[in-house]
Amino acid sequence: YEYRKKISTIDGILICGDIAFSGDEQQYNSATTFLNEICNALNLDKSHVFCVPGNHDIDQKITSSQMAVALLQKKLDESKSTTEFDLNLGKIFRKPEDATVLCAPISCYNNFAAKYGCSFDQKPTWKQEIAINDTFTLCIFGINSAFISNEHDHKPDQTERKMRISRMQIPERKENTVYLSLCHHPPECWVDPGKILSKKMDDRIAIQLYGHKHLQMIRKTSYGIVVGSGATHPSRLESDWMPRYNWITIDIEFEKEVPTLIIKVYPRVLDDIESKFIPDGSINGEYLNFSLKGRNIRR
């Protein structure tokens, strides 16, 4: 379904992690080739690809064999509170040699992502800005949620170990700026007592995009939307196998000088004969429309 023919400008490609299957260099070579083809088809420069790592971007050969990596991950994983985790992560990133060790399991991801300005070699976040209009800027904000991911992500009973993010990975408010975040693990997969982190995300970020779970989920928050984006290439062994992706458009309209953020999400799914992606028939109409006012869209 060639939706690109219906819109005037395509500004970027957003990837919420699990670009590889096991953090292997050859897998990223394949991903680079694939993204080059998409960029060429959409007339996009590669600087307009935005991505974050997921648990499948972790090279478990490194986490299972390098004691220095294991010790730093253990220190973070055993943090007894969000505040302690913040302090421990901050200490690591203030020492370049420690940051290099912690990020070793995503070294192949970082080599791949550096082409797009989205590596996490010496920092826990990245950000890039795109003008929406003469007044407002879209700040795309990448968050690494896979710092402690390793071969122990699944417990003996097959439940998933929860990941960690830090308050320092959540952006500060900025006038005339609309935040769009990319993070692989959704809030329900975080260690987040009292849901302080997820509430802070809802309070500051207008558009939150997540991966990890292969089922699409879109919900509105008090000040924005959250999109669990499904998967473009899930395992065929999954019982609810459904390859999908989304188009997202962003605009700002003014009503009596009050700015309103207009977001349209166009879900696309693979058709029955696995030939092309088509509009998701489970929603009413071709897209989901959200109009947002309030603290995440203001001058």
Predicted features by range, described:
Residues 21-24, 57-62, 148-151, 189-191, ...:
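Short catalytic/ligand-binding loop motif for oxyanion handling, primarily in non-cytosolic enzymes
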Residues 135, 187-260:
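Conserved beta-sheet core of the metallophosphoesterase superfamily
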Residues 145-209, 218:
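Active-site-proximal segments of metal-dependent phosphoesterases and phosphodiesterases across multiple
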Residues 80-176:
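Binuclear metal-dependent hydrolase catalytic cores centered on His/Asp/Glu-rich metal-binding motifs
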Residues 11-18, 44-55, 179-188, 204-218, ...:
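Active-site neighborhood of phospho(di)ester-bond hydrolases with catalytic His/Asp-centered motifs
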Residues 1-95:
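Core catalytic region of metal-dependent phosphoesterases/phosphodiesterases
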Residues 250-299:
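A short C-terminal boundary segment appended to hydrolase-like catalytic domains
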Residues 61-66, 220-222, 239-240, 277-278:
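Short aromatic-enriched loop/helix-cap "lid" or pocket-rim segments at secondary-structure transitions
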